[in-house]
Amino acid sequence: MRFNTLDDMDLAGKLVLTRVDINVPVDGDTVTDATRITRIVPTIKDILAKGGRPVMLAHFGRPKGAYVPEMSLRVTVPALEQALGQPVNFIERPDRATLDALPEGTITLIENTRFSAMEEANDPKMAGFLASLGDVYCNDAFSAAHRAHASTEGVARLLPSCAGRLMEAELSALEAALGAPQRPVVAVVGGAKVSTKLDLLGNLIEKVDTIIIGGGMANTFLAAQGVQVGTSLCEHDLGDTARAIMQKAAAANCTLILPGDIVVAAEFKAGAANAVYDVDACPADQMILDAGPKTVETIAATFNTAKTVIWNGPLGAFEIAPFDAATVTAARAAAEETQAGKLISVAGGGDTVAALNHAGVADQFTYISTAGGAFLEWMEGKTLPGVAALEAAKPA
């Protein structure tokens, strides 16, 4: 994969349209989690250091092409100023003359791009208008790269364009995980339903050596093999699909690891009475809520011989103890191998990030993607419009 970075760009004296993701949670007028804001700081600082004037483009919420006061980006300005250590100039209705008049060192934020219906329609008129506001385009919003919108794809084809530092790090990590990985490659795929991971499994089978299947979706595969799963969450209607996936994996010489032992309970609540059974001995009135200790030992041993791990989804109902044990123990095993320099570990997806934070190891993986849908679509092998536009772009 080839794309320009900030290192390839001459930014001195130029207005740099910078697409960021600052779609952060708020409570009234206060940002409650500034993680996405702090992650864009290196890009903004580097643009300033190279003599450019960053003009940030971003969306906030889903206003559906209308002006919604509660979805104004103005609410993010205090958090941006705190993270960046300097004032941020907020402009509701930008024009080139106003931006040209800004002194060197100015950071600007333009109002919510989704206040115009032309944004999500990737309307050429809006892309052209945005392009008229800058000299260079920098995309630092991998999390929005799977959307072909005017501010993520359209404008990138009209200006010299590059990836910001966060985008660069994300693409480099994903390339290391799936593009040209060190082998053996192990994928952990968990979550509640097989139906949401069909494209993902189909793509991974062709690219990795082993897939560990956990969470509720493992029950569907077990049932497809004739295993009784009691009252567990299970998509029984996808039995044929699960069997087809297993056949495809066998043909591709991709090993599938399913739970060999299970943790069951009669109800899903904190501290519920639970027991460990071999996978073929699940009581009819119980539900599978986690993988058992023998399965976790198998997973840890698999990590021990792997060179690359890609993780998407928890191994059990990690939100409630004690059904978090498999996810926590396996995550710590992967983190330990990573910290020892033996493993490249890349993880992403909302539940995955929450699970790794719960295990206390999110900062011990090689890379944690907070991109959500874009991360999943990348793992599914789909083309991301925002990334494709950067690959086709010319440097400044």
Curated annotation (Swiss-Prot):
Enzyme class: transferase
UniProt GO MF annotations: ADP binding; ATP binding; phosphoglycerate kinase activity
SUPFAM superfamilies assigned to the protein according to its UniProt record, in alphabetical order: Phosphoglycerate kinase
The reaction(s) this protein catalyses: (2R)-3-phosphoglycerate + ATP = (2R)-3-phospho-glyceroyl phosphate + ADP
EC number: 2.7.2.3
Superkingdom as given in the UniProt entry: Bacteria
Gene Ontology CC terms: cytosol
Positions of ATP binding: 197, 319, 349-352
Kinase keyword on record: yes
Complex and partners: Monomer.
PANTHER family per the UniProt record, alphabetical: PHOSPHOGLYCERATE KINASE (PTHR11406), PHOSPHOGLYCERATE KINASE 1, CHLOROPLASTIC-RELATED (PTHR11406:SF23)
Family from the record: Belongs to the phosphoglycerate kinase family.
Name recorded for this polypeptide: Phosphoglycerate kinase
